[in-house]
Amino acid sequence: MTEHLTLPALLKRNAELYGDSRVAIREKEFGIWQSTTWQGYYQHVRDFALGLHSLGFQRGDKVAYAGDNRPQGLYAELAAQCLGGAVVGIYPDSHLDQVEYIINHSDAIYVVAGDQEQADKVLELKSTCPKVKKVIVDDPKGMRHYDDPILAYFKDIEKQGRQLARKQPHLFNEMIVAVAPDDVGMINYTSGTTGLPKGSMITQKNMVAVARLQDMVDAARDDFEYVSFLPFAWIGEQECGVYWPLYKAFAVNFPEKVETVQENIREIGPHILLAPPRIWEKICSDIQVKIQEAVWVKRFIYQKFLPVGYRMADFILTKKDPPIGRRLLSWVAYLLIFRSLNNYFGLTRLRHAYTGGAPLGPEIFKMFLALGVKIKQAYGATETTAATIIHRTDDIRLETVGIPLPEVEVKTTDTGELLTRGDMVFKGYYKNPEATAQAIICLLYTSDAA
């Protein structure tokens, strides 16, 4: 039963079920995609978790992660949770004062820094973040001459963990079994637009629930691919890049760098893609440029068939059945033109395409719909563990953000504020009972207008 599941338990299940037979993670390094199986994923998490344990990490402790999307971010997050602790997300572009506040407020005692830039931030804050015991660096490039005793390196912590695993081979699994659905697995900080950021406590139950409910609406398979490039500190990326892949055992792919995201999307051809409006707008712009730069014959064909796609988009949006002739013409347009365009941009295999964080212009929605790509708007909040309201594939209405996920109760107050209830509603704000009491009165007060 899913009510007893946790992310650590899902990781263990996937490793036992798939072992080395299926890829769980890919990362592009030096131009080559490097693969990690489910067994490898499990071993990395085990090694880092036991390494943290050997440093003194105890149940309820926190690990902060500041860095770009890399497998080590997943390993650190799951390792903390396997030990009964929580991960704290820090955006890689956060300023020093933001980093200082989050580390201190969350009581993080270990910080995993993705690279030299992130490590330098934390080292600069040593005197004002006295609780931090170790700064664990993933990529030590440029840090050869650093000799601060607070520094440690990711691979060295994993090595310590492997040594402990050999001495106590059952310890890690015993720790996984001890993790409970009500355990806080993540403290995710709000933007702080109405004051200081508040730390939302997300439980294992919340994480599994949002993955389960998402999958009830948009089913995924274990052979699906996802490209992870939005910050781990954003709850939307947590849902699509951490919780859902663990729940359905599909692969997560990490781009080589921020500048190669679109190129790497083309290479992978994901089945699931979550992107903010700016990314969809950029792809749309690139499609239009490609059409304009095509040889005159192709450009002529594009110009003749694009109206066919737009007409089909109108039928879809107005929920009208197109005539058979129009439907056949649409298939011809897709086979001759749109499929090759989608393939060039890595969109051919897309089954579930999402946008969130801000509204996407209706003209962008319609352009992709004309090409056969159904982008769905999603609404959620940190306090609801990401999306709770989402478009359905067969019910996309540009004037709305969709309908609630199954088992999610949504109401509005007399003033139009949205209220939400369900298993995905967070436990409360860390060290802020007053704000928690204001937010949760049977239902979650989202502060958003319905």
Residue ranges and their predicted role:
Residues L11-T36, M143:
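AMP-dependent adenylate-forming
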Residues A24-L78, H95-E100, Y153-E158, Q204:
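Conserved AMP-binding/adenylate-forming core of the ANL superfamily
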